[in-house]
Amino acid sequence: MDKIVIDGGVPLRGSVATSGAKNAALPIIAGALLAEGDHLVRNVPDLADVRTLGRLLVHMGCQAERNAGEKGALWIRVPAAVQPEAPYELVKTMRASVVVLGPLVARWGKARVSLPGGCAIGARPIDQHLKGLSALGAEIRLEHGYVEATAPRGRLRGATFTFDAQTVTGTENVMMAAALAEGETLLRNCAREPEIVDLAAALVRMGARISGAGADEIRIEGVETLRPLDHVVIADRIEAGTFLAAGALPGNDVTVQGCVLEHVEALVEKLRAAGAEVLPVDGGLRVVGDGRPRPVDVRTAPHPGFPTDMQAQMMALLCLADGSSKITETVFENRFMHVQELQRLGAEIAVDGKTAVVKGVPELSGAPVMASDLRASAALVLAGLAAQGTTEVHRVYHLDRGYERIEEKLAPLGARIRREKA
């Protein structure tokens, strides 16, 4: 098992490139199941979750391999028939595995998918996925830890469905299923994240008829067949946001290439409020951290609000603020597990339910810490970069689920960071 070792307190200078978005790539790769033939998905990050989904497709009878001629390209061949099952052994570590459910039942009329795993950050129910698919005519059974879905008529049928709560993967799952359903589907109270817009764009390139992605209502006119996919995945706004937060640490000056301002506006607003200078540059954003951050209050919300996936990284920055900040988590339960580890570095944080009060300190001090989930691990890396002395981040398999060799991206900026065997 690996650990990340950081000798902190060194200013960061330079430019870093953003990888493709994991949370866009995964549903787009799953969407390839909707059409027979050879698919090419470009700008796909080399991450554990992506590799797991590739193994799942191979288990089903597809071929999936990296295209040696193009960095970041994933070639997928989908046959006329597959084994429509996602077994627990393959998907136990990846919550996003549930996105194969919609494509499988839409194209082959049946699916058996293990209930998802992934980060342990509270309740992430898939009931909205199942209600949406039921509205399209699927019959759902939960048995022995699996979701079994069938289309009794052979094909799903269009319907109007309102999500009880906004759900990104739920919106994606039902939208993909509706693409091959008979008739029109109207989805209401949809999630609005950029990754949903990118998935819709990929499906439209396959011949789907989808409008409204990125808004509250999405309309899908079902078609009988789709064609193979060739699509470039958008940049990862959370990875970009993590590097923006690194640039906002005191004394740093970092340019994040490939970062789309419209995707990170809520974060940029808070970074500027904290005193960082954020400047649009050709192909990205430049962030300059000038002295200790100012305290700011942050409240997470679905897109276009402040992303829950940036809450931990923002907390790491505010640990050094000149004053007290309040962070309120409204999206997920149990998402302050990084607090105890930040406290080991000298942070002063008090948690009361869904709110954390961060009393800034002049400096942090390096120490061994342990990652509890994906974004918590990123927060610990940021804190370690700013801390005086050596920080060791353990259980970095969490980090590898969402960041493509983060140490290799930070080192050219001047960070004294390396990966070692724990």
Swiss-Prot record:
Function: Cell wall formation. Adds enolpyruvyl to UDP-N-acetylglucosamine.
UniProt-annotated catalytic positions: 119
InterPro entries from the UniProt entry: Enolpyruvate_Tfrase_dom, Enolpyruvate_Tfrase_sf, MurA_subfamily, RNA3'P_cycl/enolpyr_Trfase_a/b, UDP_GlcNAc_COvinyl_MurA
One record GO biological process: UDP-N-acetylgalactosamine biosynthetic process
Catalytic activity: phosphoenolpyruvate + UDP-N-acetyl-alpha-D-glucosamine = UDP-N-acetyl-3-O-(1-carboxyvinyl)-alpha-D-glucosamine + phosphate
The keyword Cytoplasm appears for this protein: yes
Protein residues bound to UDP-N-acetyl-alpha-D-glucosamine: 95, 124-128, 309, 331
UniProt GO cellular component terms: cytoplasm
Encoding gene (name): murA
Biochemical pathway: Cell wall biogenesis; peptidoglycan biosynthesis
Location within or outside the cell: Cytoplasm
Pfam families per UniProt: EPSP_synthase
Modification sites for 2-(S-cysteinyl)pyruvic acid O-phosphothioketal: 119
Gene Ontology MF, one: UDP-N-acetylglucosamine 1-carboxyvinyltransferase activity
Chief location: cytoplasm
Enzyme class name: transferase
UniProt keyword GTP-binding, yes or no: no
The family this protein is said to belong to: Belongs to the EPSP synthase family. MurA subfamily.
Designated name of the protein: UDP-N-acetylglucosamine 1-carboxyvinyltransferase
CDD domains: UdpNAET (cd01555)
Disulphide-bridged cysteine pairs: none
EC number, UniProt record: 2.5.1.7
Binding site for phosphoenolpyruvate: 22-23
Alphabetical UniProt keywords: Cell cycle, Cell division, Cell shape, Cell wall biogenesis/degradation, Cytoplasm, Peptidoglycan synthesis, Pyruvate, Transferase
Upper lineage: Bacteria, Pseudomonadati, Myxococcota, Myxococcia, Myxococcales
Natural source organism: Anaeromyxobacter sp. (strain Fw109-5)
